[in-house]
Each structure stands twice: as C-alpha cells, then as structure tokens.
Amino acid sequence: GINSRDLTYKSDTDKKYFAFAQQGSLWLYETGTKKLTQVFSFLQNGKLDARDIYDENNIRIINIDSSGNMTFLLCGYMNRCKHEGECGVAVYTYDAATTSITERLYVETQEAFSLLDKDVENLGYMSADRTHFYLTLEGSFYDINITDNSVTEQFSNLSSGCYVGSSTGGKFAWLQENKKYDSSTLNLRDLETGNDTAFTCDSDERLQPIGFIDSDLVYGVAKVSDIDTEDKGSEVFPMYKVLIVNSAGETLKTYEPDGCYVIGGSVNDKLLTLDRVKKTKRGYTETSQDHIVNSSADDEAAYGFAYVESDKKQTETILKTGETIEEGTTPQILYAKQVKAEGEEAAEVSIPAKKQTEELYYVYA
C-alpha cells in the first residue's frame, strides 16, 4: 500500500511470520498459508470518528517466535477500551493458535506522547517468562514485576546520552559515572539473566554509548585531550574508535577511521550510520558519514520493505517475504479477538511525573 517510509517490521528466525504496523493497526502475515491477521487496531469497521484518527500513539513490536506468537506494546494516548482517555504503555501478547490478544500490563504515565514514545523506543522490554517489564522513563530505569504489580526504580536521574537500551535484544547499558563527556566505565546488563558486564578504558580515555544492533552494544572511545566541552550545547566527543561488543564481554568488531573521528551514530535495523568529523586548526569540521552493516544483513536482502515509484500510485510500499505471490492473489484476512488471561487480570501500575534534574530542550519544528 501507499504509506510513509517510517515503517518497521519484525519476523521470526525462520522468516515464516512477518509483523508490521501501519496507520494505527498491527498486522501479521503468515507465508505458506498466506493468511493476513489484523492483530490490533483502534479503527472500527464501517464507521470512523475522532477516536479512530487520533494518532498520538504508536505500536511497537517487541518480538515474534517461530509459532507466530508475538509480544507488542502500545504507547501514548489510549483512544478506546478500558484505558480510554489515559496516556501510558499497554503491553500485549498475541496467541497465534487462538488468534487472540491478551493485555498483560498497563503503565499509566504523565509524560507527553512525543517524549514517552522516545523513552519506549529506547527501552520497553518484557522478559521471556512474562513476569517482568523493563522501561526507561524520564531518565529512570524501571523494573515492573507483573506478578505482584510492584515497581522498582533500578536507576534514577540518568543524564541524556548516558544510557541506551535494546527492546529487541533485552539489554540495557549505562555510564557508571553518569557523565556524558567524562565517564570511563560502561555497564551492560542482560535483562534476562540480570548479569552485568563492565567495559572500561585507559586513564587518558573516555567512553560513550552509541546504541544497539539487536543485542550487541555499540560504543565509542575518545582521548581526553580531544574532547571539547567549552561551548555548552556544542560539545564534541571525537571517538577515535568504535567497538561492537556482546554481553559476554567479547569484541565483535573494532572500527578505527583514518584521518577523522566519530562524533555520534544511529542504528536503523541492521545498519549502523556513523557521523564523522575532521580535526583542523579551527576545530572540528563535518565530513562524510560511514556505515557498518550487520553480518546477517546480506541474508536479509530478500526480506523487508521495498519501495516502487509510479505515476498512478506514487510511492508504493511492498513487504518482501521471500516468497513469490502471483499478481491478483488476495490473502485470507483474519481479525484477532481480545481475551483475558485465564484466572487473572492484567497488571496495572502508575508512575508519577518526575521533576527534571537537567535542562532539556525539545525542537518541534
């Protein structure tokens, strides 16, 4: 269909099931049977009102297994259902065998959607046994016990740029000193095991996290003598090398650019984009970006979203599933029903707004 390019999908390891969200609805496609299931949507069949088109919410897929079972969450304003009118994070599981979804947890917050969505993008992860949900919110890292509705604030007052999370890989990393430009220990926690791994540097160096590629942590190392913090808001942390590591402490890849430095980066699926600068007599100047592709990215070429341009349909989005679908073939469409977990109600907790401990500015336009 015709959509924006800001789309993501997830699949199981066997590439049998593909889940994707578009226009406020979550869909699951099963190859082979060619069944397309609407897993979740606020939209009503046959009629629309303001609640259908209000888009201050977002669907995020956490994981999907080889049977098509899925964990996903909805963050932001709740257009309908029992939480209608509230703002928060609802965590659901989908059972492919019964074509049904179950709400496991609802977290009520006071944070605006634009900020909440960024927090959940950083980390919103449910443990494999469905007993714990981990969330970053307003500079704090929370462990929510779904079995007894308890909330534990593991870390608080985390500064911007001092922590990163992986919702798909179940990992969380934070600078021990909590100083973006002056930290020498970076801790990595496996949320399934609770084990921590510490990464350190030499005394004349400092560390900074960049992000995650799946469950692998990406961070950079800079020399203290190169770091420029004189102009507030224009600080430069020039990393002379970038490392990709796993939770066992093993270095999977080391990137050391020649004649330039890395000052930041972003991860889009399996592609790591690095922003770079060169050092001149007048300071640091921008230079070309560089990219690191995950080793499995080549295997992904037959899957994912592709874009076709035409005068009639403009930019059309196509989901590649690795199978050939004859033109004119229409998938069987199913609609999931919502059920309660047997003998239990969904856990509900509320996290109050926190007083900001650092000045933050958000650019809206």
Mark where each language-model region is:
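Surface-exposed loop/turn elements that mediate protein-protein interactions on large endomembrane-trafficking
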Residues: 1-3, 25-54, 82-115, 136-156, ...
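Hydrophobic beta-strand positions that form the internal "hydrophobic ladder"
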Residues: 18, 70-72, 132-133, 172-173, ...
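N-terminal non-globular leader segments, chiefly Sec-dependent signal peptides
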Residues: 59-80, 86-93
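Residue-level signature of beta-propeller blades and closely related beta-rich strand-turn architectures
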Residues: 24, 76-78, 139, 178, ...
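Repeated scaffold domains used in trafficking and secretory/extracellular systems
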Residues: 2-10, 46-65, 109-125, 157-168, ...
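Short, hydrophobic/proline-enriched secondary-structure or compact coil segments at domain edges
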Residues: 16-20, 70-74, 270-276
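Loop/turn-rich, solvent-exposed surfaces of beta-rich toroidal or solenoidal domains
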Residues: 164-167, 171-175, 180-181, 207-232, ...
